[in-house]
């Protein structure tokens, strides 16, 4: 068992490594830094190009390992770290090969640095992994920094659906395993076109508060039905849009937000709905996406 983090020199920065170290400490296991270099389609007549590509691939892998080692030297004290490099026609498939080969518990990804307003900008590789990974995927916001190397609290995103009750239970088991407190959080968000302008902001605010009140009742049922214990914090956060709502959630340094997903296909895989996707995009803390 190990934690796998995808890393390529100069691409996503050290945020993914910071998170990967914390996840490895949470699981009390080793860390594997995986560099996947895209392999082009074989062309027998271009032997010299193939040789140049192989050289470039080896140099990129070596540069990625050196860069990761520079960051991890001061971060990963007491953690066994190994480095894997392979060429693959698909970066996402290459990472999944490493995950399956090493029986990884979690796959850690970074966010593109140019996320504009969004804190997490998911590229095509991360998007495919979030929809196909057989293990939980942890993704970090761009330029994320944490001042503790431990997990301080696990928040569970609750969408008030029948499937999300099971997610709360799974998060409860994780919180117990990690030895940290748990919070169950849901969001009541005013959209841009919630109502036409003539309705007025007061009416919108009233409807939003009604939604929030209903969400509080649904959260309290989790406690009444024994899904969560008395020490679990239940919280509804409102906001004018997802960015404001996520900012208002009173995050702790060292906190992680866990989201559940729906099964997709014949086997358990991550399948993100719009609710989860918006939370991932604007979350100021790392997000742990659990397979369906």
Swiss-Prot record:
<protein>
    <recommendedName>
        <fullName>Universal stress protein Rv2319c</fullName>
    </recommendedName>
</protein>
<dbReference type="InterPro" id="IPR051688">
    <property type="entry name" value="USP_A"/>
</dbReference>
<comment type="similarity">
    <text>Belongs to the universal stress protein A family.</text>
</comment>
<dbReference type="InterPro" id="IPR006016">
    <property type="entry name" value="UspA"/>
</dbReference>
<dbReference type="Pfam" id="PF00582">
    <property type="entry name" value="Usp"/>
</dbReference>
<dbReference type="InterPro" id="IPR006015">
    <property type="entry name" value="Universal_stress_UspA"/>
</dbReference>
């Amino acid at each position: 068992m190990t934690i796998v983090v995808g890393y390529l020199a100069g691409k996503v920065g050290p945020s993914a490594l910071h998170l990967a170290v914390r996840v490895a400490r949470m699981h009390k296991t080793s860390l594997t830094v995986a560099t996947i270099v895209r392999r082009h389609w074989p062309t027998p007549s271009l032997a010299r190009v193939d040789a140049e590509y192989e050289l470039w691939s080896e140099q990129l892998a070596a540069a990625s390992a050196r860069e990761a080692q520079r960051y991890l030297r001061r971060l990963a004290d007491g953690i066994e770290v190994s480095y894997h490099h392979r060429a693959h026609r698909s970066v996402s498939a290459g990472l999944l090969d490493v995950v399956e080969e090493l029986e990884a518990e979690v796959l850690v990804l970074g966010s593109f640095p140019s996320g504009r307003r969004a804190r997490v900008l998911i590229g095509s590789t991360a998007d495919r992994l979030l929809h196909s990974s057989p293990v939980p995927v942890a993704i970090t916001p761009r330029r994320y920094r944490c001042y503790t190397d431990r997990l301080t609290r696990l928040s569970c995103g609750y969408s008030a659906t029948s499937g999300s009750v099971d997610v709360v239970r799974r998060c409860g088991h994780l919180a117990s395993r990690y030895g940290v407190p748990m919070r169950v959080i849901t969001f009541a968000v005013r959209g841009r076109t919630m109502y036409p302008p003539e309705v007025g902001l007061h009416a919108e605010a009233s409807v939003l508060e009604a939604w929030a009140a209903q969400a509080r009742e649904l959260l309290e049922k989790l406690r009444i039905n024994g899904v969560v214990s008395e020490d679990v914090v239940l919280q509804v956060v409102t906001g004018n849009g997802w960015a404001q709502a996520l900012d208002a959630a009173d995050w702790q340094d060292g906190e992680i937000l866990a989201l559940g997903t729906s099964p997709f296909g014949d086997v358990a895989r991550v399948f993100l709905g719009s609710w989860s996707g918006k939370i991932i995009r604007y979350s100021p803390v790392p997000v742990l996406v659990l397979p369906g």
